[in-house]
Structure formats: C-alpha cells, structure tokens
Amino acid sequence: FDSYGFTKRTTLANYGYIKEFLDSKVKRTMIRSRLGVLKNHVPNSSLAELNWHRDEIICQNIRINIPITTSPEYMFEMEGNDVYHLELGKAYTWDTNIAHRVLLTNPAPIDRVHFVLGFSPWFDYDENNQCWESNEFWGKHPFQMLVDGDVFSGLEILKAE
C-alpha cells in the first residue's frame, strides 16, 4: 500500500459540499481516500462480489466508510462475522486488516456509492518540509481516537451487536 503517498486533496475535494464537509469534520491528516462506486451487477457474478481483501492495519490507516447511495441488496461481510447492510445516515469503521468484502445478494435498483476516508492516526504531514512527523496521539489506539473525537467530529459511536 502507498497510502502515505497521497498528501494532497484532489481538485474535486476542494469544492462545494465535499470541501465544506471535510473542512468541518476531519481532524487528522487524510491519506488514501475515495468515492467508491459499485455498479449494479448480476448477483453471484465475479463483478458483483468484490474479492476478499485486507487493507493496512488501523495504526497505519484508520478508515471511515460513509454510504452515499445504497440499497439492502448490497451487503458487507467480514471474515468470521455476519453479513451487514451499511445504512445511509451512518458512518462505519472496522479493523480493515481483517479480510472483508462487499457482495450483492440480489439485483439492486441503484449503484452503491460510498465515501471511504482514510486517516493517518499517528502521523501528520508537514507540507513545508514535505515529510511525515509523529503527532500527539502517537501510541493511542485509533478506535479510542474515534471515540474521543480526535479523528472525525460528530460521530456517534455504536457497538455492533
């Protein structure tokens, strides 16, 4: 992964509501983030189910997943866990180093669009010196940083049942 190679927002992220949202909510240095679109494919096809994958450990990249458009046919599955529907109006995070995937259970009426934000929990980018430096949160568990509002403001933390 080269998440730390991404040190600047794209042009799109500096306009309109996206800029307003990021400026008002984000408290840590953003790294590899995206607006992910999963087209409505045929269920159980190789295109409908993203392959199982792992991302960086949470101490390197803590992610927040915000559904923009979705429907109940799009499900999220983590290795060793149940299958979940990520609902609109909520933000989600998990240990992305545990294998996970998105799957489509039936034809969906719309495409799935999620805002996936990655944050560096323990390092901040110094634009002037063009380097990463450890910050005041060094060693604090990234999930506790979320609970304490150190990463992203306005999150209500709910425990999965």
Give the residues covered by each predicted segment.
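Short, solvent-exposed loop/turn segments at secondary-structure junctions
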Residues: N40, I57, T69-E73, Y92, ...
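A short beta-loop-beta micro-motif enriched in histidine and acidic residues
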Residues: S46-I64
